[in-house]
């Protein structure tokens, strides 16, 4: 259905619309605003899905799409948690216990994209925008449990902002390979407990094809 929507939109906009697919490896670092919740190691995830550029002028586009964004990380709770909410009920996390989160969101970026003219077979671009996200899955490893549902600990909505650069290499006609780097920082608390605020820094290695 999503593919059909993009193709219909492309037919309506003609040369003013570009459709793409991408698979971005992502490195995530969690951040905490309290001293008793400590982020541990970074986590490798991915951002997979569709891109759509609606051109307002030759070198300016409204950039959006829909992707499945896999993220997470490990938090160390130095004071412990008395009522960590998991699928099997409220469980305690001992002092200095760790929880590794594996969270998936549907992400719908909203951005402005600026592009150069064609230079040889290359086009260079920069983009800046926001990233609304809807949680679709949240699992965690804790207390010797693995892949346990922890949806009750993770907020349903999240939001970030991003800035990125990239390049497109023409493969002939309307088809181009693209790659680039993008940084996204979230500013909405990922977890539900009110005593802390967990956000993330993310580095995206952008890879895809534009049609």
Predicted regions, residues:
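Bacterial N-terminal signal peptides
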Residues: 1-10
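Membrane-embedded beta-strands of outer-membrane beta-barrel proteins
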Residues: 48-50, 108-112, 126, 163-165, ...
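Outer-membrane beta-barrel translocator domains and adjoining extracellular loop/strand segments
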Residues: 31-37, 74-81, 138-146, 190-196
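Outer-membrane beta-barrel domain signature
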Residues: 37-39, 97-101, 150-155, 192-196
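Short glycine/proline- and aromatic-enriched beta-strand/turn motifs that initiate or cap beta-hairpins
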Residues: 13-53, 210
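Gram-negative (and chloroplast) outer-membrane scaffold detector with strong preference
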Residues: 17, 23-27, 53-141, 210-211
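Predominantly the C-terminal beta-signal and adjacent terminal strand-loop region
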Residues: 71-77, 152, 158-211
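Residues that define the transmembrane beta-barrel architecture of outer-membrane proteins
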Residues: 15, 40-46, 102-108, 122, ...
